[in-house]
């Protein structure tokens, strides 16, 4: 069993009441698998195993192996419903990954060279992240665990857009395919405090 494998079992007792009983009595997370050429399938997963998997950021952008009563399913995490106060998972949606067909998935952005960025180190600016993740389209074998955004040469006042990101081979950004070149990050000038602001008499001189 690797880090991206989960054991699951088919569930036939459906509905909100059944889901509550699963979570309360058996510490199981109710979930559903859909997509591909097969019908949706309701399953349950051990809550502690799922929680451990989710500790790894890569689990959200990695093809997972679901072992459902001995039958393997390649899936992606599509959506999680969490408890509003305690944060644990109440329900999960998985979408099937079909070999030979492109998939869409949300991938985290990793920003590198921030402290040594021209706009920060030489110009005293501050970096602001507009996005922390992006939706990508690619073949299953090309799905990256994360995408790097290099901030090394970004200056104060400069905005980095999606078209500025160097993408891994075979990976496309869904937003760009729809004509939206969204801002990803920028370096803005440092805020000037009242103490540092020039006084009126100084400005008059």
Curated annotation (Swiss-Prot):
Give me any GO biological process, just one: translation
Query: Which Gene3D superfamilies does the record cross-reference, listed alphabetically?
Result: Ribosomal protein L25, beta domain (2.170.120.20), Ribosomal Protein L25, Chain P (2.40.240.10)
Which domain of life does this protein belong to? Bacteria
Q: Name one GO molecular function term.
A: structural constituent of ribosome
Stored CDD domains = Ribosomal_L25_TL5_CTC
- Record-linked SUPFAM superfamilies: Ribosomal protein L25-like
Q: Which GO terms describe its cellular component?
A: cytosolic large ribosomal subunit
Q: Which UniProt keywords apply?
A: Ribonucleoprotein, Ribosomal protein, RNA-binding, rRNA-binding
Q: How does it assemble?
A: Part of the 50S ribosomal subunit; part of the 5S rRNA/L5/L18/L25 subcomplex. Contacts the 5S rRNA. Binds to the 5S rRNA independently of L5 and L18.
Q: Which family does it belong to?
A: Belongs to the bacterial ribosomal protein bL25 family. CTC subfamily.
Query: What this chain does, per the record?
Result: This is one of the proteins that binds to the 5S RNA in the ribosome where it forms part of the central protuberance.
What is the name attached to this protein's record?
Large ribosomal subunit protein bL25
Annotated organism of origin: Stutzerimonas stutzeri (strain A1501) (Pseudomonas stutzeri)
Q: From which lineage does this chain's organism come? A: Bacteria, Pseudomonadati, Pseudomonadota, Gammaproteobacteria, Pseudomonadales
Gene designation: rplY
């Amino acid at each position: 069993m690797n880090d991206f494998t989960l054991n699951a079992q088919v569930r036939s007792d459906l509905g909100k009441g059944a889901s509550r009983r699963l979570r309360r009595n058996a510490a199981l997370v109710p979930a559903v698998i859909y997509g591909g050429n097969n019908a949706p399938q309701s399953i349950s997963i051990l809550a502690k195993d799922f929680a451990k998997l989710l500790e790894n950021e890569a689990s959200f952008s990695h093809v997972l192996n679901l072992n459902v009563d001995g039958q393997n399913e390649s899936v992606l995490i599509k959506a999680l419903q969490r408890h509003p106060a305690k944060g644990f998972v109440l329900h999960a949606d998985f979408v099937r990954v079909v070999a030979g067909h492109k998939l869409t998935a949300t991938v985290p952005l990793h920003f590198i060279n921030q402290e040594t960025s021209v706009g920060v180190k030489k110009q005293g600016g501050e970096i602001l992240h507009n996005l922390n993740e992006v939706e990508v389209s690619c073949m299953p074998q090309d799905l990256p665990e994360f995408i790097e955004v290099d901030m090394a040469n970004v200056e104060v006042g400069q905005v980095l857009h999606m078209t500025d990101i160097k993408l891994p081979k075979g990976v496309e950004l869904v937003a760009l395919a729809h004509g939206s070149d969204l801002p990803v990050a920028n370096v803005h000038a440092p805020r000037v405090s009242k103490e540092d602001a020039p006084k009126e008499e100084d400005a008059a001189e």
